[in-house]
């Protein structure tokens, strides 16, 4: 089984990114052929600073490796180094409807936030995302709940292409974590945790100091009542139960049993302690890795070579199926 996912090199990684994506990436190394991409091209679809983007690619690579990605057990590369992605994106536009792209929630939300220019790249984002995955004929795409509609679109694109030009692509499945699919802001649990749209005190960053993490959980908003139980009217406590369940690798019901009869304050302190201890090794290892950009660049370049070897074969099949470029010559067999 081939597993593929991409991660944005924008902003500091928070607990939602870590539980919803990075933990899945690490586990994927034991489940199949894992291919992970730092999507710098996607990051250019909104306003950005070029020098900052380059630095954040290294930040992201370091945090992924610190979390447990092993370049010897997976392919880790920078999207912009594998040009097959962009050519495949263009070819896939022939089987993608404008209406589908206009309906994407991410396009509508981000286009409102753009002050000067809503780029065509922002509209085309899901097509490039489809190219990212389909180039490797991936079977599974680990994503958060907010990316479900993009995976559904890439599935539709793959099916449409196969029907029009012949069986070429694998139709991928999404893999959304059962626990922690949407980590909420600790101060405003009605919305998801976010580096850009969330509150500073409600956003736990992976590289936060342990004391800062504990402090944020102690100050987290709770709900009416006194029982450590999930419920639709208890978004704050539900969020923290699901966070601790993800940290422990257990079902939320197990957390509820462990804290039966305890006060909210004790529960919040316990969650803060466990999250801080869980992230501490990642923070320490990140510090060791981030100081050697040459080593990180070497890992990304080696990963790009491996990725290109796969994607180029897929692109050749796509071009042949679509009639783009010269016809393939038959294999020359020895007399």
Model-found features: residue ranges?
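Short, histidine-centered active-site or binding-site loop motifs used for metal coordination
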Residues: 7-9, 40-42, 139-140, 197, ...
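A generic secondary-structure signal for well-formed alpha-helical elements
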Residues: 61, 68, 96-100, 138, ...
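Conserved nucleotide- and phosphate/pyrophosphate-binding catalytic cores
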Residues: 149, 155-335
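N-terminal Rossmann-like or analogous alpha/beta NTP/dinucleotide-binding catalytic cores
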Residues: 2-131, 274-277, 287
